[in-house]
Structure formats: structure tokens, C-alpha cells
From Swiss-Prot:
Residues binding Zn(2+) 2: 107
Protein's job: Contributes to the transparency and refractive index of the lens. Acts as a chaperone, preventing aggregation of various proteins under a wide range of stress conditions. Required for the correct formation of lens intermediate filaments as part of a complex composed of BFSP1, BFSP2 and CRYAA.
Protein name: Alpha-crystallin A chain
Localization of this protein: Cytoplasm; Nucleus
Cross-referenced InterPro entries: A-crystallin/Hsp20_dom (IPR002068), Alpha-crystallin/HSP_16 (IPR055269), Alpha-crystallin/sHSP_animal (IPR001436), Alpha-crystallin_N (IPR003090), HSP20-like_chaperone (IPR008978)
Modified residues (N6-acetyllysine): 70, 99
Amino acid sequence: MDVTIQHPWFKRALGPFYPSRLFDQFFGEGLFEYDLLPFLSSTISPYYRQSLFRTVLDSGISEVRSDRDKFVIFLDVKHFSPEDLTVKVQEDFVEIHGKHSERQDDHGYISREFHRRYRLPSNVDQSALSCSLSADGMLTFSGPKVQSGLDAGHSERAIPVSREEKPSSAPSS
């Protein structure tokens, strides 16, 4: 019995202009054929499955909301515990860093690390910032906005990450 090691030419990635899961947040979790050519997946495969690449983009891995009264960041950090996360505010930026040491999973050993930096609006009250991690791995960073003309208090400080036992209430986009 022959086993094909290389995909046929029409199922291979066609270069940097086509979406691929190789370098996104799911690195190390496997790559599917429909991730390489999502626009052809419905024509090639009789059993069409929605591309995970498109689903992930639509779900809002990192979502920033800024309305009149509040500034909120939602970030999917399901592979990290609160002890693995560092959240700090420095001047007009919030920096979220996650790192866990090498651990074993289904496919071998893996270690993960990310660093995100977001600009805070100038009218966010930095003394009232909060950060929590839901049971389903959604990090929520939020802060109220102050009325214009008041000092928002810009200094460097760490924001503790609290753990919630319920899943996130963040609606998907």
C-alpha cells in the first residue's frame, strides 16, 4: 500500500499571499489542508468544513472596545494560568505578557510565550484598572474613562490578574 507523503500540487500552499495557520496563535496544534487554501476547500472537498483560520478571525482572539464610559480588552489566553501572565501599565500603554515553561502535550513538549501592547486612551482612569481571567481562558482588562479635563493618573504599575470560575461573557464578533 502506497502512502502519499506530499500533497498534490493543487492542495499545496501557493506562497505568502494565502492565509496559513503556520504562524498564528495555534502554532503547534496541527495544520489542516483547508487552512492552506480556504477558498478552494469547498470545491475540492465533498465534505466541506469551515476554515479554522476564518473562524478564529471572526471569533476575536484579541478584541479592543472603547466606548464613552469604558475601555476593555478581551484576549484569549486559554493556554496560560494567572501565574503565567503579567499585566502592567506604563504611561499610555498596557503590556500583557504570557509565558509558560516547557510542558508535555499530546504531540510532545511545548512552551509558549506572547507579548501584546495596547495604547490606552488618554482619559482612562489608570487607578481603577482591573484584569480578570475567566474559566474558559478569556483575559478581560478594563478601566473606566474619566470626564475630560480630569487627570487620569499616568504611572507605571502592575495589574494583578484575578481568576473567575465562570466562562467569559464576552460576545464574539
